[in-house]
Every structure is written in structure tokens, then in C-alpha cells.
Amino acid sequence: MTVALCYGLPAVWQADAQILILGSLPGVTSLRAAQYYAHPRNQFWPLLQQLAGINASLRYEDRIAALKQQRLALWDLIGAAERRGSLDSAITPASIQLNDFSVLLQQLPALRAVWLNGGTAAKAWQKLNKAGLTLPAAVQVFALPSSSPAHAALSFADKLQYWRQAYQQTLTTNTGE
């Protein structure tokens, strides 16, 4: 049985973004809503509420505006892939088509950090690096635990600790500007 390709969402960014948060591929709920991290149990927006004061209960459009105001950008490493359901483990590896980051990275001159949201994102990032993607030396890369509800190995508090550490290290690096 053939599985249709799932296509990701467009990048959410602005030229002054300092942090680019990269997921793997949006789940079914997010794709249907055309919204990043739309699943009600995904902890992404609650994590950003704790880190950057972005109210997780705002309408999606308002959360995106607040995200941009905080100089954060969003995208996914996988632009398209075959997948049954929403789990990253259901992605057919041979079908993965990575997004082209070369153009986006040129549009982000203030970029200071790339945050990889979960293990699948980290693996896809490694593939991009092997394919020749290069970042300016000042850009830090953080592999973070997934905000997905499927990643239950860590509690919200534990995930928040990792995400907060990345946030603080990114801010500390930027204090010299």
C-alpha cells in the first residue's frame, strides 16, 4: 500500500530572528490546522510561555506575532516524507526530503542559535551537515528533548530545564551585542 507524502508548513521567521527552532515534520493535527504545534498535548507553546512569556492560550496568530517579537523563528527540517499518522517513528526514512536551509539562513543575519526539537530533528540536522550545510561560527546548535506528547520519557519540568538552559546560553552569548 502506498503512503502519500506529507508536506510541512512554511517557515515562520523575520530578519531579526536570533533563534531558529526546528522540528521534524508537523503531525496530522498541525497539518490539518496549518499551525505549528497544534496538538493540544504538545508542550511547545507551554515551554515558550515559560521561557519567553508567550501566552500559550492566545490565538495562534497572536502566538506567532509574539514569537516573532521575541526574535524566534520556526520551521521543520523535513519538508516532505511518507508517514502514516503523526509519529516520527512512522516516517519512511527513504522518503525524507529535507528543507533547503541555504536561502533561509541567508535571510537571518542576527541568528545566534538553532534549537533542534527532538531526536528526529537532530538526526535530520546531521544529514544536512553531511550534505554541506554550514553555519556561521557564532551560531550555537542545541539538541533539545522533543516537545511532543509522544516523548513521555521526560516530564514537562525536565524538558523545561533543557530548553531553559539553551535559552539562557543563547541570551548569555548575545549580551555582548
Placement of each model-derived feature along the sequence:
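Hydrophobic packing residues within well-ordered alpha-helices of enzyme cores
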Residues: 48, 124-125
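Short, hydrophobic/glycine-enriched beta-strand segments
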Residues: 18-24
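Internal catalytic-core helix/loop-beta-alpha segment
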Residues: 69-124
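A general structural motif
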Residues: 16-17, 110-112, 138
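Short, solvent-exposed loop/turn segments at secondary-structure junctions
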Residues: 26-29, 43, 79-83, 119-123, ...
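C-terminal capping/extension of enzyme domains
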Residues: 1-11, 39-40, 87-102, 126-177
